[in-house]
Amino acid sequence: MTGWIIYNGTLNIHKINKLVKSLVTEGKKLNIKLEAVKNTEIIPTYNNEGKAELLYLKELESPKFIIFWDKDVLLARHLEKMGFKVFNSSKAIEYCDHKGLMHLELSNNDIQMPRTILSPMIFDYLLNSEDYLIKCYEELGKEIIIKESKGSFGMQVYLIKGKEEFIKKVTELNKRNVDFIMQENIKSSYGKDIRVNIIGNKVIGAMLRESDKDFRANISQGGKGKLINLTTEQEEIALKVHNVLGLDFSGVDLLFGEDNKPILCEVNSNLNFLSFEELWGKSFGAEILKYILEECLW
């Protein structure tokens, strides 16, 4: 069986390249010819009759399935239009890639999350009133988490202390025309969270991530991980989030609320599972491929 794994051709990030290679290697063990394809090596196009097609920069076999390890949502949707089976789906990737959209989609589903405010659309920051900023500041408290709507590995996330710093950061983001969300700071989860790794409708394993140097617990930001057993409540909320967003595989990040109550932090469709694999001692990538094989038999 032939499959593609699509990744971004303009990012030269070692951990992504390593992850792609590991999936290709695991594919060989399962008699899957998994071809690594940069998103810049296939060009989405529409002919004069409006039919979705591809231009190829290299010779490729037609795939039975496509693992989409990128956030090029338009390309993913284009491939779906052409009839390819894409994991994760373009819609699920879109929800996870935009933090505001993720919270919007998960709202009204009885899922605990930090109090969150979406940034308004700004055309000219010079015409923007500070009234809404003051209101947001009063609602969220003196310590506020600001997250750019698009960002990975714990980057583009800021812990803001005080009104002056808050207004300064929001003004800077507005100048750059960046979407963002504003959240209350869950102090009980400072420097620690849980990454729940899910495939299909099953929790494969979970990792406690802790940092004694930063409010973010991401491994990429210097955090350390160890395997843990989830409580029933933690597992239920992670699976619920995963299913509401329609994901095939995901990494759901949970915070610790008061009395260790699980609170959603965010969801990753293109999760970096290498750190988890090192602790687990098994191949998470192989489990993804086994799941896809089962799905492709239907």
Language model features with spans:
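Phosphate-binding site of ATP-dependent enzymes
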Residues: 155-241
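A short beta-strand motif that forms the metal-chelation/ATP-contact edge
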Residues: 195-198, 260-275
